[in-house]
């Protein structure tokens, strides 16, 4: 259904604005009407600015000597001609006055003011008409068909919701009653075009029950058509979604205003509050104390006396605007304080409600001494699942959250592990750097002592007395005693270390045995072999009182030969040891051990299937031999000393488990290196068992 625009009273006939049905969406742009203003529109400006306004057809020229844009001072109401006439006589008389009389006269002159009891007139009555410039005319919109019963407060609010309004002037008739049309000026071309788009189909609801609704008529100058087209092509085309959202918000606000206007009680209450606020502002403006600046006749030279009332009124308007801005600022502060108070009150109510819910939950389930974090997490978990979810959906949602929590915990553990490994690697690097620095320092100090002792001259040192021995013999003796005690302690430690090495002979043998375990080949010894070497006969009448607990081996490993190319023979875990009448020499013993070690299979499957005499795998062998070897190999494979893997491997051998099972257990940690690592460990175990059995 389309509504026709009703013609405003007292206005000339104008082309009708095309209507759009109510079913059209807001986002569809509506073609506005561009029509010329009435020929006699200038005569309407008198009604805008009062009966005393005058229309200036010719604007102020640019070459005018007066600059009205500068700050204007308020002048007192002096009789200009009388002041000019009396000024010359006063200057002549002042020459003959005493000094004190001159100062009194100056003081009286400074206190001269115009009476402030004059009643200020309103802007509509006294402010003269200022013709709009071309830019203002391009942003001006004629609005007609306004209901006369509608207060001007609502029109101002509607226009401000449509765009940034610069001014709104509603025409009044001779009886000072509002007419059905007015002029609205907007701040920018964009705001003007947006308001024209939003208000083109705006309908004022009925102001009383059973009354008709009225559609506003919008008329603007024909020249504004190019402005509107430019806005559509530039702003509306490039930022279409943004403009659509803005227009939707404007229309939504206008709908809310229409609801307030259509409700008589709400409209009356708002109009009454606005009228009271306006009367209060006018009363405050009347009570504002104006400070006037005294002037003399010289200040009035070059100013048209007829413009003094206009200048005074401009100053008054400036002061009124300043006072109004202060009141607006104070009102904004009060509103912010009230909003903040309301916000804090709501937050306190929310916390109080959460506390009540928590107390109800504790009393319902009889839960006591539960951490607040646990209860809050439970409440959040319950609130986060919508009530519309079915049991299956709630189950899958809880499962998804549980999986997400487990993933987060896994990543956290991985992060901690990475940080721990980085710290451990940095510590190892620092330790290696420290050892290298100590080695360099010791080497340098030894070189220094060697050079000093080589060129030391007792006679020369006694003569120059640079050494402590010649400077202070008693101090040198004390220091030497301390140094000697330190050296004796170090020598004792070195002797213990040498005894331990002699007992085990393990340093060189372990290296060569590990090379064989890794490469599957024996290492050639540099010690010469004699085909007809000497032999030693040892006659023993009885067994030693205390047999050695473990074999001291090392010589056979140093004499191992390279593995031959032929296939190794079968290996028995319990080889028969020959019992010659005379003790074997080192060469024969090494040859026999080499033949036994060569029989150990190299392939992984054959090596893993080889039986092990677990009765000879003692705790001493595991701790002193196997643990050191496993530790070294773990560091070679993963770069760090992982104690958990070392302990797991040793425990696996201690429990007499096979190699295949160890490979499956270490697959996650070592991946493709697990079979090679296990083969080296078990090959080394077989070598140790052979050496132990021959001890």
Curated annotation (Swiss-Prot):
Gene Ontology process terms (BP): mRNA 5'-splice site recognition
Transmembrane segments annotated in the record for this chain: none
Ranges of compositional bias, category Basic and acidic residues: 85-96, 487-506, 548-561
GO annotations of cellular component type: cytosol; nucleus; U1 snRNP; U2-type prespliceosome
PWI domain: residues covered: 605-695
Keywords: Coiled coil, Cytoplasm, mRNA processing, mRNA splicing, Nucleus, Ribonucleoprotein, RNA-binding, Spliceosome
Regions of compositional bias (Polar residues) in chain numbering: 98-113
Gene Ontology molecular function, alphabetical: mRNA binding
The RRM domain, residue ranges: 139-221
Location of this chain's protein in the cell: Cytoplasm; Nucleus
Subunit structure comment from the entry: Component of the U1 snRNP particle, a subcomplex of the spliceosome. Interacts with prp5 and usp102.
Protein name as it appears in the record: U1 snRNP-associated protein usp107
Lineage, top ranks: Eukaryota, Fungi, Dikarya, Ascomycota, Taphrinomycotina
């Amino acid at each position: 259904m389309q509504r026709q625009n009703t013609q405003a009273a007292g206005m000339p006939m104008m082309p009708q604005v095309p209507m759009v049905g109510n079913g059209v969406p807001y986002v569809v742009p509506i073609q506005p009407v561009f029509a010329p203003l009435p020929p006699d529109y200038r005569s309407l400006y008198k009604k805008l600015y009062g009966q005393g306004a005058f229309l200036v057809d010719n604007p102020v020229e640019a070459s005018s000597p007066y600059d009205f844009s500068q700050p204007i001072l308020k002048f007192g109401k002096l009789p200009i001609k009388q002041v000019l006439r009396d000024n010359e006589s006063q200057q002549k008389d002042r020459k003959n006055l005493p000094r004190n009389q001159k100062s009194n006269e100056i003081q009286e002159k400074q206190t001269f003011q115009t009476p402030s009891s004059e009643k200020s007139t309103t802007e509509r009555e006294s402010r003269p008409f200022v013709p709009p410039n071309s830019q203002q005319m391009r942003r001006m919109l004629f609005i007609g068909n306004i209901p006369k019963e509608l207060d001007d407060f609502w029109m101002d609010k509607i226009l401000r919701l449509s765009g940034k309004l610069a001014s709104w002037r509603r025409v009044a008739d001779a009886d000072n009653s509002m007419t059905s049309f007015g002029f609205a000026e907007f701040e920018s071309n964009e705001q003007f075009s947006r308001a024209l788009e939003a208000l083109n189909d705006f309908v004022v609801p009925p102001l009383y029950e059973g009354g008709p609704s009225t559609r506003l008529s919008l008329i603007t100058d024909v020249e504004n058509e190019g402005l509107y087209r430019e806005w559509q092509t530039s702003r509306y085309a490039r930022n279409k979604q943004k403009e659509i959202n803005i227009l939707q918000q404007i229309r939504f606000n206008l709908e809310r205003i229409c609801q307030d206007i259509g409700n008589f009680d709400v409209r009356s209450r708002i109009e009454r509050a606005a009228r009271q606020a306006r009367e209060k502002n006018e009363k405050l403006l009347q009570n504002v104390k104006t400070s006037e600046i005294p002037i003399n006749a010289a200040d009035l030279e070059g100013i048209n006396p007829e413009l003094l009332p206009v200048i005074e009124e401009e100053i008054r308007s400036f002061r009124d605007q300043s006072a109004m801005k202060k009141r607006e600022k104070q009102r904004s502060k009060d509103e912010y304080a009230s909003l903040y108070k309301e916000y804090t009150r709501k937050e306190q109510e929310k916390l109080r409600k959460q506390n009540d819910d928590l107390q109800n939950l504790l009393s319902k389930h009889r839960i006591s001494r539960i951490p607040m974090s646990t209860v809050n997490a439970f409440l959040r978990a319950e609130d986060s699942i919508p009530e519309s979810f079915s049991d299956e959906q709630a189950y899958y949602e809880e499962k998804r959250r549980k999986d997400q929590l487990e993933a987060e915990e896994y990543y956290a553990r991985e992060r901690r592990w990475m940080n721990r490994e980085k710290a451990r690697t940095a510590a190892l690097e620092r330790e290696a750097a420290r050892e290298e620095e100590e080695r360099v320092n010791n080497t340098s100090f030894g070189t220094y002592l060697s050079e000093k002792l080589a060129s030391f001259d007792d006679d020369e040192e006694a003569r120059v007395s640079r050494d402590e021995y010649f400077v202070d013999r008693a101090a040198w003796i004390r220091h030497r005693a301390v140094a000697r005690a330190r050296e004796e302690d170090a020598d004792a430690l070195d002797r213990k270390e040498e005894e331990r090495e002699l007992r085990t002979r393990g340093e060189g043998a372990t290296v060569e045995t590990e090379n064989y375990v890794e490469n599957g080949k024996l290492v050639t010894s540099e010690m010469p072999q004699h085909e007809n070497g000497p032999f030693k006969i040892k006659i023993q009448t009885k067994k030693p009182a205390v047999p050695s607990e473990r074999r001291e081996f090392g010589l056979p490993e140093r004499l191992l030969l390279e593995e031959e190319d032929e296939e190794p023979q079968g290996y028995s875990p319990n080889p028969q040891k020959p019992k010659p009448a005379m003790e074997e020499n080192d060469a024969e013993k090494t040859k026999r051990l080499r033949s036994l070690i060569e029989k150990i299979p190299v392939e992984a499957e054959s090596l893993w299937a080889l039986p092990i005499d677990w009765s000879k795998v003692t705790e001493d062998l595991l701790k002193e031999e196997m643990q050191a070897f496993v530790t070294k190999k773990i560091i070679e494979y993963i770069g760090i000393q992982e104690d958990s893997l070392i302990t797991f491997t040793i425990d696996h051998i201690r429990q007499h488990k096979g190699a295949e099972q160890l490979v499956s257990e270490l697959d996650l940690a070592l991946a493709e290196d697990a079979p090679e690592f296990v083969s080296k460990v078990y090959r080394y175990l077989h070598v140790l068992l052979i050496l132990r059995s021959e001890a």
